[in-house]
Amino acid sequence: MADQLTEEQIAEFKEAFSLFDKDGDGTITTKELGTVMRSLGQNPTEAELQDMINEVDADGNGTIDFPEFLTMMARKMKDTDSEEEIREAFRVFDKDGNGYISAAELRYVMTNLGEKLTDEXVDEMIREADIDGDGQVNYEEFVQMMTAK
């Protein structure tokens, strides 16, 4: 879901994430979330903060990492997703511009996003999106993956 964001949006969210991640350890805790929300004039309870974290905490470790944060932001923007945004996202992944996303290109972009993926995990992501079985993802397959509910 986060891969439907443009490079510019991802950069903006990285900045926002850094504002929350006070100690710079790559995760947002309930304490850090509370600090930022209070600085924005909100007054969430500890339980509310925990609920907000749990909502996006995919791996269940009690904190939000950047990929989880991106997923949350992407969800909020999902309704405004246009064909142009999807095409732009495809271009971000299709580094050599040949119309296909290879495993190497996917790995490169994911690594730049701070995702440390094994070759198996990258191959698995390609397989899931690769409808025609050619080992890479073309634009149509990418659109299918991005618009799948």
From Swiss-Prot:
<feature type="binding site">
    <location>
        <position position="94"/>
    </location>
    <ligand>
        <name>Ca(2+) 3</name>
    </ligand>
</feature>
<feature type="binding site">
    <location>
        <position position="134"/>
    </location>
    <ligand>
        <name>Ca(2+) 4</name>
    </ligand>
</feature>
<comment type="similarity">
    <text>Belongs to the calmodulin family.</text>
</comment>
<comment type="function">
    <text>Calmodulin acts as part of a calcium signal transduction pathway by mediating the control of a large number of enzymes, ion channels, aquaporins and other proteins through calcium-binding. Calcium-binding is required for the activation of calmodulin. Among the enzymes to be stimulated by the calmodulin-calcium complex are a number of protein kinases, such as myosin light-chain kinases and calmodulin-dependent protein kinase type II (CaMK2), and phosphatases.</text>
</comment>
<protein>
    <recommendedName>
        <fullName>Calmodulin</fullName>
    </recommendedName>
</protein>
<feature type="binding site">
    <location>
        <position position="61"/>
    </location>
    <ligand>
        <name>Ca(2+) 2</name>
    </ligand>
</feature>
<feature type="binding site">
    <location>
        <position position="23"/>
    </location>
    <ligand>
        <name>Ca(2+) 1</name>
    </ligand>
</feature>
<feature type="binding site">
    <location>
        <position position="32"/>
    </location>
    <ligand>
        <name>Ca(2+) 1</name>
    </ligand>
</feature>
<feature type="binding site">
    <location>
        <position position="132"/>
    </location>
    <ligand>
        <name>Ca(2+) 4</name>
    </ligand>
</feature>
<dbReference type="GO" id="GO:0016460">
    <property type="term" value="C:myosin II complex"/>
</dbReference>
<feature type="binding site">
    <location>
        <position position="105"/>
    </location>
    <ligand>
        <name>Ca(2+) 3</name>
    </ligand>
</feature>
<feature type="binding site">
    <location>
        <position position="59"/>
    </location>
    <ligand>
        <name>Ca(2+) 2</name>
    </ligand>
</feature>
<dbReference type="Pfam" id="PF13499">
    <property type="entry name" value="EF-hand_7"/>
</dbReference>
<feature type="binding site">
    <location>
        <position position="141"/>
    </location>
    <ligand>
        <name>Ca(2+) 4</name>
    </ligand>
</feature>
<feature type="binding site">
    <location>
        <position position="68"/>
    </location>
    <ligand>
        <name>Ca(2+) 2</name>
    </ligand>
</feature>
<feature type="domain" description="EF-hand 1">
    <location>
        <begin position="8"/>
        <end position="43"/>
    </location>
</feature>
<keyword id="KW-0106">Calcium</keyword>
<feature type="binding site">
    <location>
        <position position="96"/>
    </location>
    <ligand>
        <name>Ca(2+) 3</name>
    </ligand>
</feature>
<keyword id="KW-0488">Methylation</keyword>
<keyword id="KW-0677">Repeat</keyword>
<dbReference type="InterPro" id="IPR011992">
    <property type="entry name" value="EF-hand-dom_pair"/>
</dbReference>
<feature type="binding site">
    <location>
        <position position="98"/>
    </location>
    <ligand>
        <name>Ca(2+) 3</name>
    </ligand>
</feature>
<feature type="binding site">
    <location>
        <position position="25"/>
    </location>
    <ligand>
        <name>Ca(2+) 1</name>
    </ligand>
</feature>
<keyword id="KW-0479">Metal-binding</keyword>
<feature type="modified residue" description="N-acetylalanine">
    <location>
        <position position="2"/>
    </location>
</feature>
<feature type="modified residue" description="N6,N6,N6-trimethyllysine">
    <location>
        <position position="116"/>
    </location>
</feature>
<feature type="domain" description="EF-hand 2">
    <location>
        <begin position="44"/>
        <end position="79"/>
    </location>
</feature>
<dbReference type="InterPro" id="IPR018247">
    <property type="entry name" value="EF_Hand_1_Ca_BS"/>
</dbReference>
<dbReference type="InterPro" id="IPR002048">
    <property type="entry name" value="EF_hand_dom"/>
</dbReference>
<feature type="binding site">
    <location>
        <position position="136"/>
    </location>
    <ligand>
        <name>Ca(2+) 4</name>
    </ligand>
</feature>
<dbReference type="GO" id="GO:0005509">
    <property type="term" value="F:calcium ion binding"/>
</dbReference>
<feature type="binding site">
    <location>
        <position position="27"/>
    </location>
    <ligand>
        <name>Ca(2+) 1</name>
    </ligand>
</feature>
<feature type="binding site">
    <location>
        <position position="21"/>
    </location>
    <ligand>
        <name>Ca(2+) 1</name>
    </ligand>
</feature>
<feature type="binding site">
    <location>
        <position position="130"/>
    </location>
    <ligand>
        <name>Ca(2+) 4</name>
    </ligand>
</feature>
<dbReference type="InterPro" id="IPR050230">
    <property type="entry name" value="CALM/Myosin/TropC-like"/>
</dbReference>
<keyword id="KW-0007">Acetylation</keyword>
<feature type="binding site">
    <location>
        <position position="100"/>
    </location>
    <ligand>
        <name>Ca(2+) 3</name>
    </ligand>
</feature>
<feature type="domain" description="EF-hand 3">
    <location>
        <begin position="81"/>
        <end position="116"/>
    </location>
</feature>
<feature type="binding site">
    <location>
        <position position="57"/>
    </location>
    <ligand>
        <name>Ca(2+) 2</name>
    </ligand>
</feature>
<feature type="binding site">
    <location>
        <position position="63"/>
    </location>
    <ligand>
        <name>Ca(2+) 2</name>
    </ligand>
</feature>
<feature type="domain" description="EF-hand 4">
    <location>
        <begin position="117"/>
        <end position="149"/>
    </location>
</feature>
